């Protein structure tokens, strides 16, 4: 609004509007709220600045810490700017409140204007022979002064409030901390796996059930009315001695009773059961479909984690690959120079436990080829029942004795295939028994 517009209205209008308003209390309350918000922004900015500085100083390390600092530094700057903007907004609200107080103080009051009008009326009423011409002119000039003063005050108040409104800063939106689209994958999975509850189908079924209940209720009411009509016919026939009317009344009462019982004891329970059954089917079907729909989504990460845990263990088994090839048994090596001695049977056929095969035996010539055959002692045909065993199996070379010096090992040594069956192992200190 401009000054001529303010001058177009009498001062009573401006004074009444200004004095009848809410007053400066609302502006001062808003200023206090903006001040509190500014302090809150400043406190949060200070606390977050400490955290960001600690992270940047090396409390956390790695790319996550760098991303954290890069995301929160702009947010801290926004908090500082928001605190400053809130403080400025509080100051502008206080300026507007002060402008209102000044305008109210400078505005001609309604009692002053009423007194001016009363004085003017008295002067005009007592203006005999023009004796009050000068006082009337002065009174009117004073009213013009108040008119101009009211317009000037309103113009000044408008300028102050307009300047405060223009100077009030507008805080922009906070910077984005979380990356856009970070939750799109989980939301997509949830949308794909969790289907909404079929409320539409439930509403249609309940509508049909309500219609069915209404029809059953009408059947019950009509049956009750028919029973009442039949009862009246029965009573009338009995009173007037009209057998056909009595018969008609009894028939009507019978069919009415059947319809009433059918509606109350059969149709109503069936409808209730149908409603409960439909609710159970919809609920159970929805739950089962969501559970089985979520199984593939949950199985993917679980199988990935399981594979990550199993693959290192399987990689450790690769060391067993060397066991696939068993070295072939070569030719018999030459006998050692000091071989276990000659076996001289003792009387009775028992060799003393302390007897050791200590005598020297000349080794076989190197050119002598010793056939290696497997021993036929102790083991039968191997494999499934009915399969034929193979006799052409390589024999162990040399004498293999599993006993030690203390007799703690196996008492029966493995004998070469060239030895006869006249020696068997017996319990003892590593000795042999001849038979």
Curated annotation (Swiss-Prot):
Signal peptide: none annotated. PANTHER family: GLUTAMINE-RICH PROTEIN 2 (PTHR46766:SF1). This is Uncharacterized PPE family protein PPE47/PPE48. SUPFAM superfamilies: PE/PPE dimer-like. Belongs to the mycobacterial PPE family. It comes from the Bacteria. GO terms for biological process: response to host immune response. InterPro entries: PPE-PPW_C, PPE_dom, PPE_sf. It comes from Mycobacterium tuberculosis (strain CDC 1551 / Oshkosh).
């Amino acid at each position: 609004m401009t000054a001529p517009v303010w001058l177009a209205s009498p001062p009573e209008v401006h004074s009444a509007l200004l004095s009848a308003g809410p007053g400066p209390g609302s502006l001062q309350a808003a200023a206090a709220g903006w001040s509190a918000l500014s302090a809150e922004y400043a406190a949060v900015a200070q606390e977050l600045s400490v955290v960001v500085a600690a992270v940047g100083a090396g409390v956390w390390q790695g790319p996550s810490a760098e991303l954290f600092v890069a995301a929160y530094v702009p947010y801290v700057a926004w908090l500082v700017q928001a605190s400053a903007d809130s403080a400025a907004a509080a100051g502008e609200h206080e300026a507007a409140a002060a402008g209102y107080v000044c305008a109210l103080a400078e505005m001609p009051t309604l009692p002053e204007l009423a007194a001016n009008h009363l004085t003017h009326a008295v002067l005009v009423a007592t203006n005999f022979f023009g004796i009050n011409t000068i006082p009337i002119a002065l009174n009117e000039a004073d009213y013009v002064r108040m008119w101009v003063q009211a317009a000037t005050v309103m113009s000044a108040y408008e300028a102050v409030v307009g300047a405060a409104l223009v100077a009030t800063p507008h805080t922009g939106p906070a910077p984005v901390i979380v990356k856009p689209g970070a939750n799109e994958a989980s939301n997509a999975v949830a949308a794909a796996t969790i289907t909404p509850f079929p409320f539409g189908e439930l509403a249609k079924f309940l509508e049909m059930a309500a219609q069915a209940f209404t029809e059953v209720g009408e059947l019950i009411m009509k049956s009750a009315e028919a029973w009442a009509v039949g009862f009246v016919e029965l009573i009338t026939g009995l009173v007037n001695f009209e057998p056909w009317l009595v018969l008609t009344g009894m028939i009507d009462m019978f069919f009415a009773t059947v319809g009433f019982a059918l509606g109350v004891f059969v149709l109503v329970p069936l409808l209730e059961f149908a409603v409960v059954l439909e609710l159970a089917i919809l609920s159970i079907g929805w739950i089962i479909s969501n559970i089985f729909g979520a199984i593939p989504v949950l199985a993917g990460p679980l199988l990935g984690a399981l594979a990550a845990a199993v693959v290192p263990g399987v990689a450790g088994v690769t060391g067993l690959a060397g066991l696939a090839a068993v070295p072939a048994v070569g030719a018999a090596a030459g006998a050692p120079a000091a071989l276990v001695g000659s076996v001289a049977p003792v009387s009775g056929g028992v060799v003393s436990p302390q007897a050791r095969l200590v005598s020297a035996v000349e080794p076989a010539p190197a050119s002598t080829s010793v056939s290696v055959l497997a021993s036929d002692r102790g083991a039968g045909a191997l494999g499934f029942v009915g399969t034929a065993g193979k006799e052409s199996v390589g024999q162990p070379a040399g004498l293999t004795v599993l006993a030690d010096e203390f007799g703690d090992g196996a008492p029966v040594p493995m004998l070469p295939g060239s030895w006869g069956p006249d020696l068997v192992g017996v319990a003892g200190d590593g000795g042999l028994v001849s038979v």
